[in-house]
């Protein structure tokens, strides 16, 4: 029996074939669940995660407790950009992970750009 592949998973695979991150310019990948937003910087040459942040992470949990989901996504973008700058990363490749560039995904990207990341 064939495995069911969702349209988002097809878009995700198509995007991942085209982009990859390096140590100098890692891949900023996001994931959104119905409740939380996750973002991380990945170096695909070594397969390691450089920076990771989420709305349910200890660092942001109390800050986003009273925010709506879009405002929480903005905080994730800001926090990720600050952590990346602290590690000397200024430019990234954006991987929307098959999600539409709209709403919370757009909020993370815009906040990261405003905080200084280039992509």
Swiss-Prot record:
<dbReference type="InterPro" id="IPR004389">
    <property type="entry name" value="Ribosomal_uL18_bac-type"/>
</dbReference>
<dbReference type="Pfam" id="PF00861">
    <property type="entry name" value="Ribosomal_L18p"/>
</dbReference>
<keyword id="KW-0694">RNA-binding</keyword>
<keyword id="KW-0699">rRNA-binding</keyword>
<dbReference type="InterPro" id="IPR005484">
    <property type="entry name" value="Ribosomal_uL18_bac/euk"/>
</dbReference>
<keyword id="KW-0689">Ribosomal protein</keyword>
<dbReference type="GO" id="GO:0008097">
    <property type="term" value="F:5S rRNA binding"/>
</dbReference>
<protein>
    <recommendedName>
        <fullName>Large ribosomal subunit protein uL18</fullName>
    </recommendedName>
</protein>
<dbReference type="GO" id="GO:0022625">
    <property type="term" value="C:cytosolic large ribosomal subunit"/>
</dbReference>
<dbReference type="GO" id="GO:0006412">
    <property type="term" value="P:translation"/>
</dbReference>
<keyword id="KW-0687">Ribonucleoprotein</keyword>
<dbReference type="GO" id="GO:0003735">
    <property type="term" value="F:structural constituent of ribosome"/>
</dbReference>
<comment type="subunit">
    <text>Part of the 50S ribosomal subunit; part of the 5S rRNA/L5/L18/L25 subcomplex. Contacts the 5S and 23S rRNAs.</text>
</comment>
<comment type="similarity">
    <text>Belongs to the universal ribosomal protein uL18 family.</text>
</comment>
<comment type="function">
    <text>This is one of the proteins that bind and probably mediate the attachment of the 5S RNA into the large ribosomal subunit, where it forms part of the central protuberance.</text>
</comment>
